[in-house]
């Protein structure tokens, strides 16, 4: 992971934030939270997706705090999967030898390749729409509490962790620890609590709009 302007580590900042989000969500009594990691270990990107799908997750949130060469760059941003990346991933999924249980627990092994491509594509498009809906809520809620990147805080990219075909997924860049101001904020417990609360409010709003199941 990235190293901050004053020596903090992204892996520590993001794990602390994830634990605080988990604590606040579980305090409501309405959520089961599964962490992709809960200590100082590296989990491969594909394994993170697999863990979310194995847990039958209704929502996947990947938390980051990256570094940039331009140390003036700061602010939070939200990423969801791009349309192009979606189509490429759908093709790759369809090509897998083991075709069973690939979409929301539905066995597609009896379907021909063309039908399976269509089913995977439809499932992923619906997932992308839900992801974009959550991203919109996140921009609103985070924007009330933190500085967002200018112009386009909701961005699109082909991050591997966003490619689960049946789990709405977002990647949250909390800020850039290469920027001293962002780094100082991200290492403060009070700020962490505030940001986690905005993430929890976003999740609550999302599930009101898109009830589980």
Model-inferred region functions:
Residues 69, 119-213:
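Active-site-adjacent mobile loop/cap segments within catalytic or ligand-binding domains
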Residues 1-113, 125-136:
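Catalytic-core regions of hydrolytic enzymes
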